[in-house]
C-alpha cells in the first residue's frame, strides 16, 4: 500500500474510525447432551477474562492507553467486555485551583473497544453456532485496522464479516476538510495474503461514503473440524454426507445473509 502524504492539521484529528469484526464458529452435535457440552466448552474458552486479555492486546497494538475496563460473564452463557481507551497517556487531573495541564486534551480522543459473545443452536438440526462481535472505535490518529490480523488469529473463525467506516472530518491548516486520512480500497488490503488464501471473500464498498464491507468464508472443509466429541469415522457414509450438507448450508446462510432450501 502507498503511504498517504502527511498533512498538517488545524487542531485535533477528530475523525472517528470504526471497525466491526463478527466471527462465527460452527459445530455439529448429535445429542442435546453433546450440544450442552459444546456450549459449555465454548463459553469457557471465550470467557470474560480471556476476552479482556485479547482486548488489552488490541489496545496495545493500536497504540492506545487503557482508561477503564468493564467485564461480565453471563448465565446461562455469553460474555461481554467494554474498554475505554485513549490515544494519549492517562493523566490525573490535579484538584488544585489553576489552569489544567495541556495533556488533559486526551479527553477529546476517547475511543472504545467492546466484545460480546452469542452461543446459540438450531432446535432440531444439531447445528450449534458461536458468534463473537468485536467493535474497535477510535478517534484521532489511532487506526483500528492495525489490530485486524491479530483478531483474525485470535478467533480462527469459519465465517468472518468485517465492516470499517470513517466518520466526521478534520481540517488542514488552510481550513480544507479531510473526510479520511489514509488510503484504503478494501479491508482486504489489511489482511495478510496467507489468510486471504484460506477464505472466499466478497467486498461491498461505498467509497464516496467511506464504508467498507468484507465477508469471508473458509475454503477448506474437513468434517472432523466440525464434529464435537467424536470423529467422522464414527458416522456412516449417509450420516457423514447429511451432516456435511447441514454444516455447509449453515455456513452459506451466514455468509450470504439469507435462508436457503433444505436439500437433506
Swiss-Prot record:
Catalytic activity: S-adenosyl-L-methionine + H(+) = S-adenosyl 3-(methylsulfanyl)propylamine + CO2
Requisite cofactors: pyruvate
The protein's assembly and partners: Heterooctamer of four alpha and four beta chains arranged as a tetramer of alpha/beta heterodimers.
Organism listed in the record: Geobacillus kaustophilus (strain HTA426)
Disulfide bonds: none
Its biological purpose: Catalyzes the decarboxylation of S-adenosylmethionine to S-adenosylmethioninamine (dcAdoMet), the propylamine donor required for the synthesis of the polyamines spermine and spermidine from the diamine putrescine.
GO cellular component terms given for this protein: cytosol
EC number, UniProt record: 4.1.1.50
Organismal lineage: Bacteria, Bacillati, Bacillota, Bacilli, Bacillales
Xref: InterPro entries: AdoMetDC_fam_prok, S-AdoMet_deCO2ase_bac, S-AdoMet_deCO2ase_core
NCBIfam families given in the database record: SAM_DCase_Eco
Pathway(s) it belongs to: Amine and polyamine biosynthesis; S-adenosylmethioninamine biosynthesis; S-adenosylmethioninamine from S-adenosyl-L-methionine: step 1/1
Keywords: Autocatalytic cleavage, Decarboxylase, Lyase, Polyamine biosynthesis, Pyruvate, S-adenosyl-L-methionine, Schiff base, Spermidine biosynthesis, Zymogen
GO BP of this protein: spermidine biosynthetic process
Class of enzymatic activity (EC top level): lyase
Note on cofactor: Binds 1 pyruvoyl group covalently per subunit.
Keyword Lyase: yes
This protein's name: S-adenosylmethionine decarboxylase proenzyme
